[in-house]
């Protein structure tokens, strides 16, 4: 069995192994093995050269190295001479031997090949090499042996690392045992499939392994050709067979005598390539160094312990800097007679080479050619080539023959040569014992003695001589110098650390170490030299001077005292007493600027802990702390610097800001008492809390911690303190305390007439109002109780001044100061922060209601806000004759809730003969209905025209700024509004904006040339500032100044009051809030941002707000707009609690918004939830205290959950205590919402508590106050929640405002208590009715918004939240889920843009309360049909449908029909009234409650258990329920046709479908007939509403159940097919004008009249008296009263007597005898004026096929049948305006009265209509019959009927006579004796002819006559 020799080469600490590997099967009995490492390096280091030893190495050494030199010198001289030259020449090879056992054979591996030392006798490599070197035997051509390196030296040089035995490692060559030579068969070459060049950082990949092939290829011999390798002497290679070679990385075919081109694999590189393993049965062949392919090592099969060898795979360095090659070849072992598999090659993918490569030529197969010296082998990827398969006959088996040892005997004595032995003896004898180690020297002695004995002995043979020679030589060679102790001492010295010793002793050590190392490295050093070096180095080590222990300084912490603006750096110091520490310096920098330096020296640096404090640091600035320590350990001063530490003080605390007032509240026994004027300290403070009211934030409640008396800055005060988590307050020096402090002044008693306390001042003046009173300091009116409406109710006649020539102020007036002042003086006193909120009171002013006598107010400035009902003014309401106000100023807001046009003025309301001069006003005036001006709205001189005009009732030299915005202005102007007749307003300037009013003067007095105009002069506006109307002639002439001109003019007025500043009171100074201007880093350019950020981070201190604000871009909206509110959102839902949010909406005062995204932040305070605004990098905190409110929430819940909607609590609250109380609650329709509120109480109450007043700490008194308030108002609170929950779920785009309305009312910028607002809403029944939602908003909710009414509020939100540009589209969008809105504009060109849309109609006063209910439909499905005259409300449920989609088609058809109807009337109506169709208040049309399951009861139930949602959600809350009354529908009309209470109610019938539309035309006729359809003349006297609808103006349809279809009427709505089967015009839209309609009506009536006439002629032609009496009946007069004027129609059969006397010869006889065909209408009395469900006679429809011949001309009002019939005939003959209006309306009533007629009669009317042509209707009818007969006789338009062609009267008459004749055959006598006849044939013919003529003439667009 064969075993392989494995060879590998690796880089060994900078020494590159050779490239090719080789192996050879060896001699038969190799018993031992050794590992050889051949190192090829062009230059061995000088250190290695110095250590080369001459002679032979000790064979007992396990490891040694043999050194060869290229044979470049003549082979002369000794080894010493060679070593001498060694420094100048190149060492060529180094063979490292690792010896494990006895060596069987030696392989010397050179750069290009293999040298084999063949025989067993040559197994000793030392001996062999020695012979080769000493005896000159050239066994290794080109090299000579130089010397060797011992194992220890190899270790020193780092070459020992290749000698590890444990496993196969790169860089090792192993010779292993080979037991028996065997033939090697079936060997294939291993080829590299590929070679990879990859970038340095690219990942390594493995390519697929090549497939194994069992086929054999012939071997190729390779002979060493590299001159750099030692060669085996000829003749000594007998035992070696040529080894088969595989070239790794090249392509070498194994065919004998063939040349193979080798493709070079890679270029050399500085980077090692990946290693690969190559295994081939037999002998692996090493590649050339320049062609070495990188192979990846692969684990080899494990060999027996004694045979294990370590392999190394060469690594090749690529020259391409960015790439490295990697290739893996896996070797395999093969056994005899087995096919050798081709090695597997793992090849990563090849990346593109950056440079081209060249392929060197190969001279002979198996002998690679090295590149020229000036070339490098190029690197290129190798494309694998498949080797050709060797034919079977070429396969061969090769065997290695056994070597033979043959001994030939010769009988001659051999000579003995002892010369060499002698030489060795001489050499050994000359050795000195001091030059070598004792052991080696002692070992030489015995050998020398033995050698000498052999030398002296004669009978020795040459072998013995040789043996002893060799032994001696070996012993000499074994002489050595022992450097072990030296090396150990050097190693010990190197373990020393420089830092531990003094510089001088350390330097001495380094000197001696260097010397010792030279000795150790010197191979020629003697043992004595070594010993001396050891002694000196040991002594130097012992003399090292050790340094003292280094001190250790550690920065352990930085203690930030944020409130004190201080940071303390704390350190620990170790070894502080072992070394001299000179100083420790802590330096604090801000950027590069050194802020502070703390130097610690002496005893301050001897403690274990030290610190450095830095004070007066700025917040939010990054400081750098640098710490340096200087010390001396013995080498002089050393400096150590610690790592820099960043320090930043970030102050983030809760600070109460923008405080309006602070009150000390005592809550005890359910009563809240303001104790802000305490005079003693209470013993029990637990029921006290501070109530801090902000100008724009929530009120904060703080439990009082302590109240104490103290003196601050000389002022005795009560100091009230409170503490809360994170709460701080700012001290006078802008420092902080961790408590809130409020000071209450201890009253100071007055001194003479100088007063220091407002309460005492009021009491004094009230007691004696005639004296002079002076203010000794500024004082607050807060919490002082007035004596009435004003603080001082008695008439003030004294003086009010400031003392000591100063300007003091009375602050925080909450009521007017005086009622009346007479002959009084108020001078040099300011009134600041006036807060008079009395919206329910009249005559509100800061100083007085009335100013009389010679009263004077001068040098006074007022600031603040006043609100009242009627008459609100800044100073006084009314100035009387002789009074004067001069050099005064008002800054603030005035608001009037007036509805009657009272006066609102910045200075006064009215000035009657007084003087106002040098007044300055900068204010905003708002109100409902008021006369308003910023100075004085009314300047009144009176009617006395005397010489004082212009000196009294004067307003002059004044200036105004600000704005006036009054909803319903009554003479509004910036300066003044009313002066008639001769008040004087002059020389004044306005910078103000007037929203709805005049820019300067507010009324047409300015154009009154007789009186007022001349005294209104020199009024100036300012370009770019002032605005408003200039509606009057003179107004347009007023000058507009530039800003510069205006300022200059104002300067000439010498007004100083606007600049008056009062001294703060001592108390005000103590409680003064620091302005932002005093805060660090304040920037005036960001002032708006700071104010706005109070809304984004409401809790945080001003310093933090400034810090955050300064991060913004100056142009950002947060710095350029005013923020009203900031609200958290989660997607599109408003978050009003502490639930998670992901964005905020910022609402600005200009009605715009921004959204900003949020991310969570962990940097908030314990009681403040914080987010980061990711868009801006600043913070946001919800305005909710983060605390546990569970107890309070549960307490409130327990109070509310016990209250039911139907309960005694609720009855008492709403004052519904009678029998109707249950239904009164039901009438609110709030059950569903109330249930929803009760089911969500916990959530709702939590939000309520969180959004109510802030409770920063735990105040039991405050909690109890809230509980008691809820208990007291529990019913109101629940109703408030229920109401808002029910009606304010309004959608704007993607958002719904319900959460805002419930818990975030301050969204709109008004500060409000959520709890108080809810209680207010639920406090009155009128506030929570569904039918008053619009009104309730204005009365209760408007004041909390920026809108005056619901319409404005909804519009504001639309603009804010959506991109929808109008309210109508928004309303459709907001209701689309539950309301379908069909809007129809007119198709008449001139009115197509008229108001018709739903929301426009709904917002009118009579319908505006429907808006919120419609916006909050939840389950029902409603529809609206809106046009310019009416709006209809219906539901899908009423139609039996379940969704809006189910009803859209039918609703749309109805909407079209409604519109067509009104358009028809607009085309028809008289010009003077048609515009009335465009109603401002459209007619509401309400659906009934006849649900599919039956009539619904009032509260939405039917079929006992079903809920009718349209009633529950809309009709019921709107109070539109009505009981079933048996009607189909009805209209509610009033005497005034424009009465907004007018409406239409469907009862049994539906509003849609054709009949529903027809009913629509019926009911709206009732609404519109008087004012529009009848020309504005109203109903004709003696008739009423029902006479005009059905049977006259209602559009007839089929299927109604009534007899109107086929009766007289007009189709105003529907388009029908012109198919010859129609009764009415087929398309009413084709009648474009009134003339078109009249033409239609003419043809319509002509045709009917002609057919009546022909029927009569045909019957009469039968000359049958019985037939006549059966065919006709009578329309008789039935007088309504005794005056026999007004009549009814009495239709009856002829009496027997009349039958007997009946004589009919012509149509005229029928007329005269008032006869009609005996068909419908039926017999009875028909009353046109009846309005009774029991009398249906006015509803009569006159069938078109019924011939009515009589006229029944009345002397008053006609009967119903005659009225309708005559109206149509007159319309047809005389047209709409003359005929129809003349007859059907009261058009001639007034004229008839003038003409002396008591009643309006037919007789009078026909004369008027016919212009006296006819005196009776009968005359008219006879003429009409004659006219149509005459026209027909001349010819008819040709038509065909019943198969007959008709073109003349005679043709038609013939057909009728035949029909009558047939009918006459049915004449019979009934049992009662009356004759009856069927008229069926005649009626059918008549109908057929009519319909044919209608078709033939296209609805009578052409005449029926020729």
UniProtKB/Swiss-Prot annotation:
Main location class: secreted
Region (2 X 15 AA repeats of K-V-E-Q-A-G-E-P-V-A-P-R-E-D-E): 277-375
Active site: 1563
Swiss-Prot/TrEMBL cofactor(s): Zn(2+)
Coiled-coil region: none
Cofactor binding annotation: Binds 1 zinc ion per subunit.
Phylogenetic classification of the source organism: Bacteria, Bacillati, Bacillota, Bacilli, Lactobacillales
Region feature Disordered, mapped onto this chain: 178-436
Protein name in the entry: Zinc metalloprotease ZmpB
TM ranges: 77-98, 105-127
Gene Ontology cellular component annotations, sorted alphabetically: cell surface; extracellular region; membrane
Positions of the propeptide segment: 34-76
Stretches for region 2 X 23 AA approximate repeats: 293-375
The UniProt record lists the keyword Zinc-finger: no
Sequence repeats: 277-291, 293-315, 361-375, 380-402
């Amino acid at each position: 069995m064969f075993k392989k020799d494995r060879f590998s080469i690796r880089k060994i600490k900078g020494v590159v192994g050779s490239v090719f590997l080789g192996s050879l099967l060896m001699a038969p009995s190799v018993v031992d093995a050794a590992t050889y490492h051949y190192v090829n390096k062009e230059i061995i280091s000088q250190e290695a050269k110095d250590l080369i030893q001459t002679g032979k190495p000790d064979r007992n050494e396990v490891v040694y190295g043999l050194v060869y030199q290229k044979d470049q010198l003549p082979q002369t001289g000794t080894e010493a001479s060679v070593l001498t030259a060694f420094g100048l020449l190149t060492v060529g090879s180094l063979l490292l031997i690792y010896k494990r056992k006895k060596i069987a054979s030696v392989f010397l591996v050179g750069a290009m090949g293999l040298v084999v030392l063949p025989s067993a006798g040559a197994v000793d490599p030392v001996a062999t090499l020695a012979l080769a070197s000493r005896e000159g035997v050239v066994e290794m051509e080109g090299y000579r042996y130089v010397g060797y390196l011992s194992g220890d030296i190899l270790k020193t040089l780092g070459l020992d690392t290749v000698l590890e035995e444990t496993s196969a490692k790169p860089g090792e060559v192993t010779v292993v045992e080979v037991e028996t030579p065997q033939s090697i068969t079936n060997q294939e070459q291993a080829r590299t499939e590929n070679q990879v060049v990859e970038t340095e950082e690219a990942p390594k990949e493995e390519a697929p392994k090549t497939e194994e092939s069992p086929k054999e290829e012939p071997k190729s011999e390779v002979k060493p050709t590299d001159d750099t390798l030692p060669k085996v002497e000829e003749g000594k290679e007998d035992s070696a067979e040529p080894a088969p070679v595989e070239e790794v990385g090249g392509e070498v075919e194994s065919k004998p005598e063939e040349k193979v081109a080798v493709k070079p694999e890679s270029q050399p590189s500085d980077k090692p390539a990946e290693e690969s393993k190559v295994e081939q049965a037999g002998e692996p062949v090493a590649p050339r160094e320049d062609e070495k392919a990188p192979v990846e090592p692969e684990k080899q099969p494990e060999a027996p312990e004694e045979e294990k060898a370590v392999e190394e795979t060469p690594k090749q360095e690529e020259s391409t800097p960015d790439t490295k090659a990697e290739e893996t070849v896996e070797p395999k072992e093969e056994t005899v007679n087995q096919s050798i598999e081709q090695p597997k090659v793992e090849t990563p993918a090849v990346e593109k080479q950056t440079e081209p490569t060249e392929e060197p030529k190969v001279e002979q197969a198996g002998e690679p050619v090295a590149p020229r010296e000036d070339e490098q082998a190029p690197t290129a990827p190798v494309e694998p080539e498949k080797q050709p398969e060797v034919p079977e006959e070429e396969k061969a088996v090769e065997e290695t023959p056994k070597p033979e040892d043959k001994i030939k005997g010769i009988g001659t004595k051999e000579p003995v040569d002892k010369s060499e032995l002698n030489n060795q003896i001489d050499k050994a004898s000359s050795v000195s014992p001091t030059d070598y180690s004792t052991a080696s020297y002692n070992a030489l002695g015995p050998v020398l003695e033995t050698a000498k004995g052999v030398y002296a002995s004669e009978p020795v043979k040459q072998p013995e001589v040789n043996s002893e020679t060799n032994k001696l030589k070996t012993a000499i060679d074994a002489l050595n110098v022992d450097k072990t102790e030296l090396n150990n001492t050097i190693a010990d010295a190197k373990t020393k650390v420089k830092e531990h010793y003094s510089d001088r002793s350390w330097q001495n050590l380094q000197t001696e170490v260097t010397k010792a190392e030279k000795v150790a490295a010197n191979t020629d050093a003697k043992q004595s030299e070594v010993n001396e070096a050891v002694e000196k180095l040991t002594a130097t080590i012992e003399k090292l001077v050790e340094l003292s222990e280094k001190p250790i300084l550690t920065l352990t912490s930085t203690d930030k005292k944020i409130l004190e603006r201080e940071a303390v750096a704390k350190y620990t110091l170790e070894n502080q007493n072992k070394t001299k520490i000179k100083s420790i310096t802590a330096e604090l920098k801000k950027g590069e600027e050194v802020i502070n330096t703390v130097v610690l020296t002496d005893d301050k640096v001897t403690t274990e802990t030290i610190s450095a404090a830095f004070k007066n640091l700025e917040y939010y600035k990054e400081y750098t702390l640098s710490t340096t320590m200087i010390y001396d350990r013995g080498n002089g001063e050393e400096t150590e610097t610690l790592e820099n530490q960043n320090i930043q003080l970030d102050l983030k605390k809760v600070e109460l800001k923008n405080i309006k007032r602070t009150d000390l509240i005592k809550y005890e026994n359910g009563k809240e008492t303001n104790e802000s004027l305490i005079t003693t300290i209470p013993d029990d403070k637990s029921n006290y809390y501070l109530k801090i009211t902000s100008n724009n934030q929530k009120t904060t409640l703080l439990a009082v911690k302590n109240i104490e008396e103290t003196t601050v800055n000389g002022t005795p005060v009560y100091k009230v303190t409170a503490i809360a988590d994170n709460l701080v307050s700012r001290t006078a020096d802008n420092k902080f305390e961790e408590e809130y402090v409020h000071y209450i002044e201890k009253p100071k008693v007055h001194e003479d007439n100088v007063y220091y306390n407002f309460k005492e001042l009021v009491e004094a003046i009230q007691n004696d109002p005639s004296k002079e009173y002076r203010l000794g300091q500024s004082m607050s009116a807060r919490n002082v109780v007035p004596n009435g409406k004003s603080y001082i109710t008695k008439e003030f006649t004294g003086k009010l001044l400031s003392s000591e020539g100063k300007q003091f102020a009375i602050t925080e007036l909450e009521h007017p100061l005086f009622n009346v002042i007479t002959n009084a003086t108020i001078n040099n006193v300011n009134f600041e922060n006036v807060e008079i909120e009395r919206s329910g009171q009249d005559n509100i002013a800061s100083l007085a209601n009335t100013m009389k006598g010679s009263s004077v107010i001068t040098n006074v400035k007022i600031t603040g806000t006043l609100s009242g009902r009627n008459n609100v003014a800044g100073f006084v309401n009314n100035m009387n004759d002789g009074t004067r106000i001069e050099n005064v100023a008002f800054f603030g807001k005035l608001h009037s809730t007036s509805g009657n046009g009272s006066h609102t003025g910045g200075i006064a309301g009215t000035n009657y003969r007084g003087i106002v001069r040098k007044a300055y006003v900068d204010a905003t005036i708002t109100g409902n209905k008021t006369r308003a001006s910023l100075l004085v709205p009314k300047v009144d001189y009176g009617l006395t025209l005397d010489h004082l005009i212009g000196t009294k009732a004067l307003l002059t030299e004044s200036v105004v700024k600000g704005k006036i915005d009054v909803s319903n202005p009554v003479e509004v102007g910036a300066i003044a509004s009313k002066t008639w007749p001769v008040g004087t307003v002059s020389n004044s300037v306005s910078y103000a904006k007037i929203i709805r009013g005049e820019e300067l003067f507010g009324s047409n007095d300015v154009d009154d040339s007789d009186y007022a105009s001349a005294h209104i002069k020199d009024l100036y506006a300012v370009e770019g500032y002032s605005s408003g109307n200039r509606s009057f002639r003179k107004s347009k002439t007023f000058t507009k100044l530039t800003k510069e001109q205006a300022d200059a003019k104002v300067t000439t007025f010498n007004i100083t009051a606007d600049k008056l500043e009062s001294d703060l009171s001592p108390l005000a100074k103590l409680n003064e809030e620091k302005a932002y201007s005093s805060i660090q880093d304040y920037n005036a350019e960001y002032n708006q941002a700071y104010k706005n950020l109070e809304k984004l981070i409401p809790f945080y201190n001003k310093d933090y707000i400034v810090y955050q604000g300064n991060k913004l871009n100056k142009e950002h909206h947060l710095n350029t707009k005013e923020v009203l509110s900031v609200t958290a959102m989660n997607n599109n839902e408003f978050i009003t609690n502490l639930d998670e949010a992901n964005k905020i909406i910022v609402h600005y005062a200009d009605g715009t918004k921004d959204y900003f995204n949020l991310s969570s932040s962990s940097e908030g305070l314990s009681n403040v939830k914080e987010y980061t605004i990711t868009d801006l990098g600043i913070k946001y905190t919800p305005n909710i205290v983060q605390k546990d409110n569970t107890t309070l929430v549960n307490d409130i819940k327990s109070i509310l959950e016990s209250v039911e909607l139907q309960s005694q609590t609720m009855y008492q609250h709403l004052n519904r205590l009678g029998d109707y109380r249950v239904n009164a609650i039901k009438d609110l329709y709030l059950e569903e919402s109330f249930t929803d509120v009760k089911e969500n109480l916990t959530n709702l109450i939590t939000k309520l508590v969180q959004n109510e007043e802030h409770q920063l700490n735990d105040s039991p008194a405050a909690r109890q106050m809230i509980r008691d308030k809820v208990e007291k108002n529990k019913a109101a609170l629940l109703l408030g929640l229920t109401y808002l929950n029910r009606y304010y779920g309004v959608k704007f785009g993607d958002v719904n405002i319900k959460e805002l309305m419930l818990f975030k009312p301050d969204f709109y910028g008004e500060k409000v208590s959520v709890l108080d607002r809810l209680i207010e809403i639920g406090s009155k029944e009128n506030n929570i009715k569904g039918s008053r939602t619009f009104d309730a908003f204005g009365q209760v909710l408007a004041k909390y918004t920026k809108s005056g009414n619901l319409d404005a509020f909804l519009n504001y939100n639309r603009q804010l939240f959506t991109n929808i540009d109008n309210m109508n589209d928004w309303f459709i969008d907001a209701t689309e889920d539950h309301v379908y809105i069909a809007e129809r504009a007119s198709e008449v060109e001139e009115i197509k843009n008229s108001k018709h849309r739903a929301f426009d109609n709904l917002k009118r006063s009579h319908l505006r309360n429907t808006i919120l209910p419609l916006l909050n439909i939840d389950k029902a499905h409603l529809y609206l049909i809106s046009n310019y005259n009416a709006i209809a409300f219906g539901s899908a449920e009423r139609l039996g449908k379940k969704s809006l989609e189910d009803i859209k088609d039918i609703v749309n058809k109805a909407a079209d029909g409604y519109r067509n109807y009104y358009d028809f009337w607009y085309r028809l109506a008289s010009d003077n009234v048609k515009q009335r169709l465009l109603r401002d208040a459209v007619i509401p049309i309400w659906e009934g409650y006849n649900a599919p399951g039956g009539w619904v009861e009032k509260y939405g139930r039917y079929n006992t258990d079903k809920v009718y949602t349209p009633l529950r959600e809309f009709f019921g809350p709107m109070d539109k329920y009505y009981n079933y009354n048996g009607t189909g529908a009805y209209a509610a009309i009033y005497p005034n046709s424009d009465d907004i209470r007018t409406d239409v109610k469907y009862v049994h019938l539906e509003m849609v479908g054709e009949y529903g539309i027809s009913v629509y035309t019926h009911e709206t006729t009732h609404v519109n007939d008087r004012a529009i359809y009848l020309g504005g003349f109203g109903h004709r006297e003696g008739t009423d509403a029902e006479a005009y609808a059905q049977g006259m103006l209602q559009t007839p349809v089929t299927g109604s159940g009534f007899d109107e279809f086929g009766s007289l009427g007009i189709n105003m709505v529907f388009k029908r097919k012109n198919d010859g089967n129609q009764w009415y015009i087929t398309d009413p839209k084709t009648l474009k004008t009134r003339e078109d309609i009249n033409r239609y009506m003419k043809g319509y009536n002509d045709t009917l009249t002609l057919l009546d006439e022909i029927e009569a002629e045909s019957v009469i032609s039968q000359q049958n008296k019985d037939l006549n009496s059966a065919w006709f009946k009578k329309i008789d007069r039935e007088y309504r009263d005794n005056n026999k004027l007004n009549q009814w129609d009495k239709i009856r059969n002829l009496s027997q007597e009349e039958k007997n006397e009946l004589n009919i010869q012509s149509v005229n006889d029928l007329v005269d005898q008032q006869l009609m065909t005996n068909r419908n209408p039926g017999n009875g009395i028909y009353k046109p004026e009846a309005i009774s469900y029991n009398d249906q006679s006015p509803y009569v429809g006159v069938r078109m096929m019924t011939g009515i011949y009589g006229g029944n001309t009345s002397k008053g009002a006609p009967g119903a049948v005659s009225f309708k019939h005559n109206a149509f005939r007159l319309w047809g003959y005389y047209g709409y305006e003359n005929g129809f209006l003349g007859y059907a309306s009261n058009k001639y009533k007034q004229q008839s009265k003038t003409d002396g007629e008591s009643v309006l009669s037919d007789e009078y009317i026909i004369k008027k209509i016919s212009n006296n042509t006819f005196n009776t209707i009968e005359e008219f009818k006879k003429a009409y019959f004659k006219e149509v007969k005459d026209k027909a006789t001349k010819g008819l338009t040709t038509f065909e009927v019943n198969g007959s062609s008709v073109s003349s009267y005679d043709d038609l008459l013939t057909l009728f006579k035949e029909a009558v004749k047939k009918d006459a055959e049915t004449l019979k006598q009934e049992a009662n004796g009356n004759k009856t006849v069927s008229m069926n044939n005649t009626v059918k013919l008549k109908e057929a002819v009519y319909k044919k003529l209608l078709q033939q003439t296209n609805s009578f667009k052409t005449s029926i006559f020729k």
